From Swiss-Prot:
This is 2-C-methyl-D-erythritol 2,4-cyclodiphosphate synthase. Homotrimer. It is an enzyme of class 4 (lyase). The keyword Transferase does not apply. Coiled coil: none annotated. It comes from Thioalkalivibrio sulfidiphilus (strain HL-EbGR7). The record marks 37, 136 as: Transition state stabilizer.
Length: 160
C-alpha cells in the first residue's frame, strides 16, 4: 500500500507600486506589484510549503531563503520544480493539489486555467489533479483593502 500524506501551505505578500502580479506563473496586469524577494508568487509559495510539509521537509524559507541573493527576483516556477525534485528524491510523487487565492483585485477568473496548466506542468501531473480557485474577503482585512494577496494550498503526495 502506498504511503499517502497531506500538507498545507499559506503565503501572503503585500503590494508595492508596480504594473503586474505573478500568480501560478501567470503575469497578471495590475496597478500594484508584490513586495517580495522573489517574484512574490503567493500561490506557488503556498503550494511549495504544502508539498514540503507533506514530505516533512520543512518549508520554502528553509530551502530558498530570502536572505540568499541567488533567489532575488527568482521565478517561483523554478522553485516549485525543485520542490518536486526533492519529493522524488524522497520517494514521493504528487497526487493532487487544491489552492485558494484570497484577493479583492485583480480578478482571477480569466487566469485560473492558465495557472492550472502551469502548475500541472511543473508538478508533472494531469490537469484534473490541480484545482485553483479564488475568493474575496468582501472588502474585509488587508486583502479587502487591497494591501496584498494571500493563498492557501493543500497537497496530497504518495510514495512510489
Amino acid at each position: 500500500m502506498a504511503n499517502i500524506r497531506i500538507g498545507h501551505g499559506y503565503d501572503v505578500h503585500a503590494f508595492k507600486a508596480g504594473g503586474h502580479v505573478v500568480l501560478g506563473g501567470v503575469r497578471i496586469p495590475h496597478a500594484k506589484a508584490f513586495a517580495a524577494h522573489s517574484d512574490g508568487d503567493v500561490l506557488i509559495h503556498a503550494l511549495c510549503d504544502a508539498l514540503l510539509g507533506a514530505a516533512a521537509l520543512g518549508d520554502i524559507g528553509r530551502h530558498f531563503p530570502d536572505t540568499d541573493p541567488a533567489y532575488k527576483g527568482a521565478d517561483s516556477r523554478v522553485l516549485l520544480r525543485r520542490v518536486v525534485e526533492l519529493l522524488h528524491e524522497q520517494g514521493y510523487r504528487v497526487g493532487n493539489v487544491d489552492a485558494t487565492i484570497i484577493a479583492q483585485a485583480p480578478k482571477m477568473a480569466p487566469h485560473i486555467e492558465a495557472m492550472r496548466a502551469n502548475l500541472a506542468d511543473d508538478l508533472g501531473v494531469a490537469l484534473e489533479c490541480v484545482n485553483v480557485k479564488a475568493t474575496t474577503t468582501e472588502r474585509l482585512g488587508f486583502a479587502g483593502r487591497e494591501e496584498g494577496i494571500a493563498a492557501h494550498a493543500v497537497a496530497l503526495i504518495e510514495s512510489f
